[in-house]
Amino acid sequence: MKVLENVNVALKANVYFDGKVTSRAIYVGGQKQTIGVVLPGEYEFSTTQPEQMQVTSGSFEVLLPGESQWQTFAEGSTFNLDADVSFSIRATDVAEYLCSYL
């Protein structure tokens, strides 16, 4: 299990899609990241700045901007997103992620 040390955690969760996706802001060395949980379902998100998403548990499919085919990302894999784009996530089981803002 990977552990993030010396982390500050926001106490209030970000809750999306009627609680089916939740995340918390964390601060590592002053850099904001979010850790989150995705319950089964399909969800569309938008970015405001470049992001790197790392799947930390389970897996989910992602429809990246400009793509027509879903791609599966399993635990330990990452994908990058530009600012001001939309993308979709489809999960069949519970999955977790770490989002780093680039």
From Swiss-Prot:
Signal peptide bounds: none
GO cellular component, one term: cytosol
Keywords: Glycosyltransferase, Transferase
Enzyme Commission number(s): 2.4.2.1, 2.4.2.2
Catalytic activity: a purine D-ribonucleoside + phosphate = a purine nucleobase + alpha-D-ribose 1-phosphate; adenosine + phosphate = alpha-D-ribose 1-phosphate + adenine; cytidine + phosphate = cytosine + alpha-D-ribose 1-phosphate; guanosine + phosphate = alpha-D-ribose 1-phosphate + guanine
Keyword Transferase found: yes
A GO molecular function held by the record: purine-nucleoside phosphorylase activity
Similarity section: Belongs to the nucleoside phosphorylase PpnP family.
Protein known as: Pyrimidine/purine nucleoside phosphorylase
Lineage of origin: Bacteria, Pseudomonadati, Pseudomonadota, Gammaproteobacteria, Alteromonadales
